[in-house]
Amino acid sequence: MSDYTRANFGGLSEGEAQFSMTARALLDELTDLEGKLRAKLDRWDGDAQAAYWNYQKEWDAAAKDMQNVVAQLGVAIREAHDNYQAAERANTSIWAG
C-alpha cells in the first residue's frame, strides 16, 4: 500500500471562506449584543455597574482572542491550499518535460 496525500482545493477554499465569515459574524453578533446591553446598563449605577464593566473587559478580551484564533485558522487553511497547489504544479511540471 502506498501513502499519498490528496487535497480538495475547492474544499480548502470553502473552508477558508467559512472561517472568515464566522470571524466576521462573531464580531457582528458581539457588537450587536453589546449595543443592546448598553441601553439597559446605562440605568445601572454603583457597584453593580462597575462589576459588570470589569467582567465586560474580560469578555471582550476573550472574544477578541477567539476571533483571532478563527481568523488564524482561515489563514492556515489558505496557506495549506496554496502549498498543496504549488506542490501539484511542481509535480505536474516533472511530467511536462
Curated annotation (Swiss-Prot):
Family annotation (Pfam families): WXG100 (PF06013)
Keywords annotated in UniProt: Secreted
Positions in coiled-coil regions: none
Assembly information from the UniProt record: Forms a tight 1:1 complex with EsxB. Forms a complex with EccC and EsxB, probably wholly mediated by EsxB.
Compartment(s) of residence: Secreted
Gene this chain is encoded by: esxA
A GO CC term attached to the entry: extracellular region
Species, as recorded: Thermomonospora curvata (strain ATCC 19995 / DSM 43183 / JCM 3096 / KCTC 9072 / NBRC 15933 / NCIMB 10081 / Henssen B9)
Primary role: May help regulate assembly and function of the type VII secretion system (T7SS). EsxA disassembles pre-formed EccC-EsxB multimers, possibly by making EccC-EsxA-EsxB trimers instead of EccC-EsxB-EsxB-EccC tetramers.
Family: Belongs to the WXG100 family. ESAT-6 subfamily.
Protein name: ESAT-6-like protein EsxA
